[in-house]
């Protein structure tokens, strides 16, 4: 077991066609495809090289019977949970992992731009004696990265209560004594404006550092299919 742990968690089911939330004007299949390749891109980034942390990949319980072969690889530590009840996930299902690892980082599966190098920077920020939090937020203030070096039920109560909204979380935790590192402008793909930004980001050469050629080709399929939305 490593001192550090990473948890990739989607906001909802995205593989079950009966309940998946369609992404903007995308078809159900393309909505599933977008969410899948965002998630699989993170898996590829974290498992391609020598592991330096324990990884826990979470899917919604309703996706259990719809997982594709890419999620079935032997090296993927897959867990299923009722994502409509994050409080149970944080306070019960992963309590043992949270308390047995020194540093923990929770990532939204909708995030782009994170690789092993970035993760190492995050863990270095958490690797201090004082209790601290690491929060990465989008321009809209949605929390997509949440790291901590000391488990606190009060902190997670605030995280769930805030619905992962940064300002609401700060208001809830103002009486708690944690130092907070804040990362601004992380990119979460939640709507069509973010999809446009994704297109711009992946058009840059530096994107190869966190998105392989294989993954680029998968995203390109969607960019071509929905080119009218990119205007």
Describe these PLM feature segments.
Residues 35-52:
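A short, N-terminal amphipathic alpha-helix
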Residues 50-77:
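Acidic donor-binding segment of Leloir-type glycosyltransferases
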Residues 149-171:
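Short, glycine-/small-residue-rich phosphate/pyrophosphate-handling segment
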Residues 67-103:
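Short phosphate-binding loop-to-helix
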Residues 168-231:
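Conserved alpha/beta core of the MobA/IspD/sugar-nucleotide pyrophosphorylase nucleotidyltransferase superfamily
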Residues 105-107:
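Short aromatic-hydrophobic micro-motifs that form the base-stacking/packing surface
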Residues 113-140:
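Conserved donor-nucleotide/metal-binding helix-loop-beta segment in metal-dependent transferases, i.e.
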Residues 1-22:
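N-terminal nucleotide-binding beta1-loop-alpha1 segment
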